[in-house]
Design a protein with these regions (language model features):
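Conserved pre-ATP/AMP-binding loop-to-beta segment of ANL
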Residues: 137-154, 161, 186-191, 197, ...
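Conserved AMP-binding/adenylation subdomain of ANL enzymes
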Residues: 163-192, 200-240
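Conserved AMP-binding
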Residues: 58-61, 82, 185, 195-202, ...
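AMP-binding/adenylate-forming domain of the ANL superfamily
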Residues: 1-152, 167, 174, 277-282, ...
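Gly/Ser/Thr-rich phosphate-binding loop
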Residues: 211-214, 240-243, 253-318
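ATP-dependent adenylate-forming carboxylate-activation enzymes
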Residues: 58-62, 76-95, 106-108, 214-237, ...
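AMP-dependent adenylate-forming
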Residues: 1-5, 87, 102-142, 172, ...
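Hydrophobic alpha-helical segments in the ANL/AMP-binding
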Residues: 8-10, 62-80, 179-182, 202-214, ...
Length: 490
């Protein structure tokens, strides 16, 4: 198998009238998804050669999934550009990608025309009105090989220019073939999707659904601001599987709505993207004692997830959670404490950025006589006494103060374990040699200082404390650390 499309064909034949992807306004059955993708694919194949990038400038919806698959039907690859992205970032992405065409939501093509410049800008309504040409699409599929690109996702770059992470078909196939059996996914699964489609966590929701015949409901973003409403939504939609960033799980736990078996019907809770504090995880586990909880780890450059840990024992609130063991067909190597990853999961590199690619994807030190790439994650790790991999923080968040080597991630873990804290993070001010603690929850600095003194050695205690009503978030739902530092003048 060279790409994901045979999975779509299979479920469209097996259960054509069953709902596949649903949002607030639209729902596509498997047959509708299949046919819409083929119509869009035919339109694109008539306009463009294979293996060119296409930008999808669309809201998150079932039609966006159809457009993604339509791009693959045409033998091309896609980038998702969210409609809420700042115009400057959109332009930087377009400049790096040089897409052959922009696909937009119905009625939005004129709005995107300015950003597109001379690029063709076409609505999905226009593309999906094309008659299906099976012979043309079959010819395109014969040209696909599994090392062709499936998508490019843009992540933040340290220079302010987003980096396009290029992922091949074979990496997605390899990931999904592991994830579906390992995570016990089948056609009874009903995902409540949180991740934006331009965020790599969505790869699991979308493509594991294609493989397993599951169902995805795109939860309205506003509902994450109102956890009580979210609990009702999950139950009304009969959602039984969540794959959310930890911040999205922490908020309802902090507000006390995760209790007494709610949200009812949840059988699986997966999380990835940032550290999940055990204090909030324990709230979920107490409310849903029979659910399967899985902690996953992996940067965008390794196709979503490279290690995983099924939560199989009791943890104290202040204990760190393991990131566990490598996924199948994946090798994790610690090089001077840095987590480095190799295997089929690896990205092809950064699109149109050979220097950045060469710096991050390097020769594996243990591979002798043959080239074998590994990706330097920039994250620090170590193995515990059980042989489980532990995440210790970012390489660039390791500081030295008063002669002591300190992991800021360990301090953050202690902050989040404090009962009165709902969210927390810390920074280091090199100029003043001060550790800065930012927290939300009860505004009681004295109590927080006292609790941290019981958890941390003196040399690790924060010097400065900022109480925040709430933390700024990135579009992916994580703490926006860059914006936070700017707001605090750090």
């Amino acid at each position: 198998m060279r790409c994901v499309l045979p999975w779509l064909d299979s479920w469209a034949a097996k259960k054509p009238d069953a709902a596949a992807f649903e949002g607030e306004k639209t729902c596509l059955t498997w047959r509708q998804l299949h046919d819409t993708a083929k119509r869009i694919g035919t339109y694109l194949a008539r306009q463009l050669p294979p293996r060119v990038p296409i930008a999808l400038c669309m809201d998150k919806s079932p039609m966006t999934v159809a457009a993604m698959l339509g791009v693959l039907e045409a033998g091309c690859f896609y980038t998702i550009i969210d409609v809420q992205m700042p115009q400057q970032r959109v332009q930087l992405i377009l400049d790096a990608l040089h897409p052959a065409l922009l696909l937009t939501d119905e009625g939005k093509a004129p709005i995107w025309a300015d950003a597109a410049g001379k690029l063709p800008c076409v609505s999905t309504e226009t593309a999906a009105s094309c008659d299906i040409d099976e012979s043309l699409l079959a010819a395109r599929q014969r040209e696909i090989i599994d090392t062709d690109l499936q998508y490019v996702l843009f992540t933040s770059g340290s220079t302010g220019h987003p980096k396009g992470v290029a992922i091949r078909h074979r990496s997605v196939l390899d990931f999904v073939e592991w994830a579906v059996p390992a995570l016990r996914l089948d056609e009874t699964v009903r995902f409540g999707n949180q991740a934006p489609l331009y965020f790599d966590n969505s790869v699991l929701d979308i493509f594991c659904t294609l493989k397993s015949g599951a169902y995805v409901y795109f939860l309205p973003q506003r509902d994450f601001l109102f956890p009580a409403r979210m609990m009702d939504e999950l139950e009304q939609r009969q959602i039984n599987t969540l794959f959310w960033v930890p911040s999205a799980l922490m908020h309802p736990a902090n507000l006390g709505v995760v209790k007494d078996g709610r949200p009812r019907g949840i059988k699986r809770v997966f999380f990835c993207g940032e550290v999940m504090p055990n204090r909030q995880l324990n709230i979920w586990r107490r409310s849903l004692p029979d659910a399967d909880f899985v902690n996953m780890y992996g940067p965008t450059e390794i196709t979503d997830v490279c290690s995983w840990y099924r939560v199989d024992r009791t943890f104290e609130d202040g204990e760190p959670l393991p990131i566990g063991f490598p996924c199948e067909n994946t090798r994790i190597t610690l090089v001077e404490g840095e987590i480095c990853v190799s295997g089929t999961c690896l990205s092809a590199g950064y699109y149109n950025a050979p220097e950045k690619t060469a710096a991050a994807f390097v020769q594996h030190p243990d591979a002798r006589g043959i080239p074998e790439r590994m990706y330097k994650t920039g994250d620090l790790g170590a193995y515990n006494e059980r042989g489980e991999l532990m995440f210790l923080g970012r390489k660039d968040s390791q500081i030295k103060k008063q002669g002591y080597r300190i992991e800021l991630g360990e301090i953050e873990c202690a902050i989040k374990a404090c009962q009165a804290v709902t969210q927390g993070c810390c920074f280091y001010q090199a100029a003043t040699q001060q550790i800065v603690c930012c927290y939300s929850g009860e505004d009681d600095e004295k109590a927080l200082r006292g609790e941290l003194r019981r958890r941390l050695p003196k040399y690790m205690l924060p010097d400065v404390y900022y109480h925040l009503p709430q933390f700024p978030q990135t579009m992916n739902g994580k703490i926006d650390r860059v914006r936070l530092r700017q707001e605090l003048g750090l």
